[in-house]
């Protein structure tokens, strides 16, 4: 998929967030990268680049204290090639991008992977 089209999917995923979450995104850049770097793989404890679809790097909002300020923005990286490697068709890519964007934004709001797994498990039970 062309980079421009993939970036548009990321923008659409952000635009599809509920307004209250969009308003609360503070001091965070969301970027598209082709592949994760070795450093990013190490931080995320992944051994293969196709396993890491997105990465949040920063200080979650729940950890920001009174002294938080004058800092570089948090960074959410969405990795295009690993997502494409896991999906066959454009609509699968779009769905996966939305899932990854929501997951990484949840980290920005302070949710850890264990909590996110529990939430996803509860969603599946309700279906």
Predicted regions and their residues:
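Active-site rim/adjacent substrate-binding subdomains
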Residues: 1-96, 108-118, 123-126
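Catalytic glutamate of the conserved HExxH
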Residues: 100, 104-108
């Amino acid at each position: 998929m062309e980079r421009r089209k993939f970036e548009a999917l990321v923008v659409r995923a952000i635009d599809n967030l509920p307004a209250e979450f969009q308003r609360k995104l503070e001091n965070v850049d969301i970027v598209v990268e082709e592949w994760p770097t070795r450093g990013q793989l190490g931080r995320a404890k992944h051994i293969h680049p196709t396993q890491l679809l997105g990465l949040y790097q920063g200080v979650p909002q729940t950890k920001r204290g009174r002294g938080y300020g004058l800092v570089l923005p948090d960074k959410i990286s969405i990795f295009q090639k690993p997502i494409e490697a896991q999906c066959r068709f454009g609509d699968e890519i779009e769905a996966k991008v939305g899932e990854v964007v929501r997951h990484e934004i949840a980290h920005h709001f302070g949710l850890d992977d264990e909590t996110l797994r529990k939430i996803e498990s509860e969603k599946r039970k309700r279906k």
